[in-house]
Amino acid sequence: MQLLKDRIRAEGRVLPGNIIKVDGFLNHRVDTKLMREMAKEFGRLFDLTGLTAVLTVEASGIALGAICAEEFGVPLIFAKKAKSDNIEGGLYQSEIFSYTHKKKVTLL
């Protein structure tokens, strides 16, 4: 997607460990128009037949995930990085590596 490439080239910074810092439009400050265009592009690129929800990771993924879920007409589910006391019932969990924090994280 050229619009996203242009924004990364214009505003992104490469940090040690090859992490691309895009907090000016993707995580700390969110450009919702760009997010909407990204959601539309995902809808164009992927077969959404049978899609029942959008799953993303808590924090940075929520903004884009919410706009994608709205665009696709399905609910948003986000995986938490820590169990809270108000979650009941069985949980799915998966271990991932966080490149930002340089450690393994268990998502619930």
Label each residue range with its predicted role.
Residues M1-G50:
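Active-site-facing substrate-recognition patch
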Residues K40-F42, A63-L64, K103-L108:
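A generic local structural motif
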Residues A63-F72:
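Short Gly/Thr/Asp-enriched flexible loops that form oxyanion-binding sites at enzyme active sites
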